């Protein structure tokens, strides 16, 4: 109690508890809720005031109006919304560019003033969000080793440091001999250095007791016991130093099992070269020198891959790069996302140096090349680019490579032997017939034989040392053509036409067959989804229509083959008038379509897909 003249100020210590209890009661009874959060299809009705008082993210979003964030892509480089109101009279899709509509009914939904009250939180798990909301309304959070990672992820995405702190405290208190490996993995994923050090103490204690054969087996194991190659090296040094007189004879053998090229050059100098036997032992000296030389030539690393430079994993993962979201602003995405098969969800891996859609990606020795595309939507190709970038998943880094000689979007790119090929497309001059070839070793572009006809929005695939190009648009007309390029002879040959004209489709190779899937064609002035799936036999030069059509129309999806299935991600459905955020999967062996759990961060048309091997610990939401 404090006095000032005839006034008295009295503090009620129970008021904050009573207020929180009252808010929790309103939440439990769903009274006066003014915003709905959706995560993994589950809805949570909440109060904006509560969210904004605890979360910097929501505070900024609600105070700024948040655009129209019907669906939020949360993570590095994510945008707050999908776009604003469409033009008063949206123009019809131009015939010469069939791939992406100028507007859709979904644009009107996104432009609704009420959209701010319904937020789809892509990248947040429903379990994690529920537990975080319980904390906001009760000051209590229920954690276990099975749920703490999801809670931690949501708290970091939504910028709620109090919950992050509680998660860290829980992990630090829970570390034991039985669970330190699991805790160490969680700590590595989320950059929790203190927790990682505590967990590693248990690991080191176990490792020091191993004999030589057990230590050697540990270094060869997949996945590795620690999150980085440097940590693996340091663990090996500790083992050797623990009984130096007896164990130092094993140093060369153990060092051969390490992949020094996976350690960044500065750390090789500061942390590896500083260890005495790495400078004095001839075998260790050579291993270090080879790694240094590897890092000196970044533009040729994709030509110098060996076991010493490959990620310690053998599991390929599905990647989605860029794409065009709905909305009249039509700014392409710069996100690179990957599908976590264990969690059944798409996660943000990194961001590109620029925004892009209608581009191509090509995997080369587990490096991802991103070529061309457009950084703004324009039906006449005014914003087509000639950019070429290479992504390195080992270090989460990008480098710029020599640009293509022509700007191009809606084209096809592939790898064949030691070359990349880019074929056709469109730019401000119109449709292209030109074909460029990039030598992966010399880092140079050159022209090779052009397509017989200018084409854009076509699909392509590589089979048996040759490149196949199907469909597309030629001078505004959809075509069923199939061309085959022989790189040895540098000639194009016309093959049997498809049964259906189509563009903005995909062409995938499996079991010596080419599958033409998705796309659309024109009937009068109307775009129609192509539902038929066609299969081509290169030996017999014959197309067959399969009995199982595609699940739903998909124009401009990302496409990749993984294991025994063909994956289509995103795209646009003309029959539904909607951009897609889901992933559908076709099994040629079973002849069936399925839909994967989990959506990408936002609906997209014109993204690109590939498969790469990622490190065991992917810090996807740092």
UniProtKB/Swiss-Prot annotation:
Residues 73-108 are annotated as: Disordered. CDD domains: BACK_KLHL14, BTB_POZ_KLHL14_printor. It is found in: Cytoplasm, Cytosol; Endoplasmic reticulum membrane. SMART domains: BACK, BTB, Kelch. Residues 33-145 form the BTB domain. Residues 87-96 have a biased composition (Pro residues). Pfam families: BACK, BTB, Kelch_1, Kelch_KLHDC2_KLHL20_DRC7. Keywords: Cytoplasm, Endoplasmic reticulum, Kelch repeat, Membrane, Repeat. This is Kelch-like protein 14. It comes from Gallus gallus (Chicken).
